[in-house]
Each structure stands twice: as structure tokens, then as C-alpha cells.
Amino acid sequence: MHIDFHDETNSVSEDYIDLIQRLLDFAAQKEGVTSEAELSVNFVDNKEIQVLNRNYRQKDTPTDVISFAMQESNEDEMEIIGADGPLVLGDIVISVDKAKEQSIEYDHSLERELGFLAVHGFLHLLGYDHMKEEDEKKMFSRQEEILGEFGVER
């Protein structure tokens, strides 16, 4: 899977980026996603993610991760017939500030928190959600299963 990484904070080490690349490749394999798929992972600060959260979710507060799925379609969109390009899943935006805060709050490593947020965002791109309790159980169980099998433990 091709992943474009953009670190707007200039604070995410190559080791973390490599880990997230391998983790998302593993998650894609577990979910049956083609190796030709593409997505982007963007690392931002709390200020930037708050703007996105306000503009797209009407919540004027920083959040830890936001996903923008490209494969979602609604009734008003016209289907593109014959689009031969790669499967573009969408964008994952992670607040490095929130990841650091939450790694302290939950008493685990920043590596674990960034991995958790990346997988969480990735599953959203695939259509998982947690708006209903049943869906939340399914999504969170899948997250923990992927992280555990990959070896990113609490």
C-alpha cells in the first residue's frame, strides 16, 4: 500500500513513520485491502486539527484523529465510470499534541498512541464507525486485534 506521510509539526521521527507504515500495511492485509491502495497520513498540531474539527464536524475543540474517506458516496454524487486509477482510500489527520497528551493520560508509549490513532483512522476509511454501541464494540475490538497481532501493546 502506498502511504504519503506529511509531518507539518516536524516532530515525528522516521522510526515512528516506519512503524506506522508497517502497521497500516499489516492492517490493510488483515482487512483484505489491495496492495495498490493509497492513502495519506498527516501529522498536525492541536491548532490545525481544531480548525478541521470545527469546519468538518462542527466541534470547536482539538481532537486526536480525523479521517476523510474518499470511497464514501452519497446520493447526490455521480459515479465515475471507467475510473482506472488506484484505489485512493483517503486521508488520516493525527494531532501529535493530542497523541502526546493521551500517551501520558493512558500511561503508554507515544509509539502505541500513534499506532492506535493510525489504525483507528484507517478503519474509519474502510467504513468502520462508532456512532452506535454495537458498531463501537466491533470497531474497537478490531483495533485491539490488529494492534495486538502486530505487537503494539499497551
Swiss-Prot record:
Gene that this sequence comes from: ybeY
Cofactor(s) recorded in Swiss-Prot or TrEMBL: Zn(2+)
Enzyme Commission number(s): 3.1.-.-
Function noted in UniProt: Single strand-specific metallo-endoribonuclease involved in late-stage 70S ribosome quality control and in maturation of the 3' terminus of the 16S rRNA.
GO molecular function terms noted in the UniProt entry: metalloendopeptidase activity; RNA endonuclease activity; zinc ion binding
HAMAP family registered for this protein in UniProt: Endoribonucl_YbeY
Record's cofactor remark: Binds 1 zinc ion.
Domain of life of the native organism: Bacteria
Predominant location category: cytoplasm
InterPro entries for the chain: MetalPrtase_cat_dom_sf_prd (IPR023091), YbeY (IPR002036), YbeY_CS (IPR020549)
GO cellular component: cytoplasm
Localization annotation: Cytoplasm
Binding-site positions, Zn(2+): H120, H124, H130
Gene3D superfamilies in UniProt: Metalloproteases ('zincins'), catalytic domain
Family: Belongs to the endoribonuclease YbeY family.
Record protein name field: Endoribonuclease YbeY
GO process annotations (BP): rRNA processing
